[in-house]
Amino acid sequence: MNRLKKGDDVIVIAGKDKGRRGVVKSFAKGGSLVLVEGINIVKKHVKPNPNRGVEGGVVEKELPVDASNVAIFNPATEKADRVGYKFVDEKKVRYFKSNGELVDL
């Protein structure tokens, strides 16, 4: 189960960008892929197409990473953390498992 939401601050825990941080922009493939700002940037060669107004050249593009390769970043501990759910005032909220602080303030 994916416990990330759009706008969460995450850290990459596996892969070529391991240790880098970013913000979740969107999800793909039912939530199994996560598009993170500034992570997994690739260079794509684009052919010019005057009909569409596209110039040719090398374009940098962000590709999604697997959700299992990112973890939510806990600013209090400055490390990756796990997320749990609990009820506060009859409202379901997320909290960091390491120190019990709420994720959604």
UniProtKB/Swiss-Prot annotation:
GO MF assignments: rRNA binding; structural constituent of ribosome
Top-level taxon of the source organism: Bacteria
Keyword presence, Ribosomal protein: yes
Function summary: One of two assembly initiator proteins, it binds directly to the 5'-end of the 23S rRNA, where it nucleates assembly of the 50S subunit. One of the proteins that surrounds the polypeptide exit tunnel on the outside of the subunit.
HAMAP family on file: Ribosomal_uL24_B
Subunit structure: Part of the 50S ribosomal subunit.
Name the record gives this protein: Large ribosomal subunit protein uL24
Biological classification of the source: Bacteria, Pseudomonadati, Pseudomonadota, Gammaproteobacteria, Thiotrichales
